Amino acid sequence: MGSQARYNMFKIFNPEGCVKQLDFIRQTTELGGTAVGLKNRSVGVLIAHNERRSRLADIQKKVFSIDRKSLFTFSGITNDGLQIVDYLIDKSVREEVIKGRAIHFLDVFEDLLRDVFERTILDGRRLYGVSGLYMTEYDGIRLVEFNPKGHVREVKGMGIGCRAQSSRTVLEAYCEEYEKMGVEELVRIGIMALKNAHPEDDALTGENVEIWILEAGKAVYNIDAKVFLN
C-alpha cells in the first residue's frame, strides 16, 4: 500500500513532506476568479474578475460591502466565501452596536481563524476552500489577505485566484509608488495587473469586471469598469 493511501486520514503529517488537504485547498483557490487589491494611506481599490463559466450562468457579484467603509472579495468555493461575508457583517454590526466603534482590521478575523485552525489540524471537518481580500478604513486604509491555511496579514497590494502570480508581478513593480497615486492611477495599476493575468482579447469586459473604491472619510462606492478597459 502506498504512503499516500496509508496517511490520507491525517491532517498534519505526511511522510512525503506535504499535507495533501492543504495542497488541494490551494489548488481550489487558484481556480477561482482573479481579484486584486492595492492601497495607500488614503485610497484603496478592489478589482475583481468574474468569468462566466457557461452561457446559461449569470455573472455573480464578487465584491461585497461589509459596511459603509469595508469591502471583501474572495476566490474559491462560493459557499465558503459567502459564509465569510456573513461572518464579517455580523462582527462589524456587533462591534458597532455593542461597543460603538469600528472593529480592528485584523482582530475581526479572530473567531474565524480559530475555526480554520481547528479544521486544519482535526480530522472530520472540511477545510475552508477560499482565500480573500478585506479592505477597511481603520486609522487609514487597510488591506488584509485571508489565507485558508489559517492566517491573515496586512498588505499594500495582493492578487488572489486564477493566475494570481501574474497579477502580483505588476503590483510588486509599482508598490513603492502607491503613496503618490490617486484613485485613477491606482485603478489603472489594478487593471494592468488584471490584464497581465488575463491577456486574451476580450477576456475583460465591463460586464465581468467590478471596480470598488474606498477613500478615507467616505463610504465605499463602485465605478464603471468600461471607462478603464477601453
UniProtKB/Swiss-Prot annotation:
Record lineage: Eukaryota, Fungi, Fungi incertae sedis, Microsporidia, Unikaryonidae
Keyword Nucleus among UniProt keywords: yes
Family affiliation: Belongs to the peptidase T1A family.
Record's subunit section: The 26S proteasome consists of a 20S proteasome core and two 19S regulatory subunits. The 20S proteasome core is composed of 28 subunits that are arranged in four stacked rings, resulting in a barrel-shaped structure. The two end rings are each formed by seven alpha subunits, and the two central rings are each formed by seven beta subunits. The catalytic chamber with the active sites is on the inside of the barrel.
Superkingdom as given in the UniProt entry: Eukaryota
Membrane-crossing segments per the record: none
One cellular component term from this protein's GO annotations in UniProt: proteasome core complex, alpha-subunit complex
Name this polypeptide is given: Probable proteasome subunit alpha type-6
Subcellular compartments: Cytoplasm; Nucleus
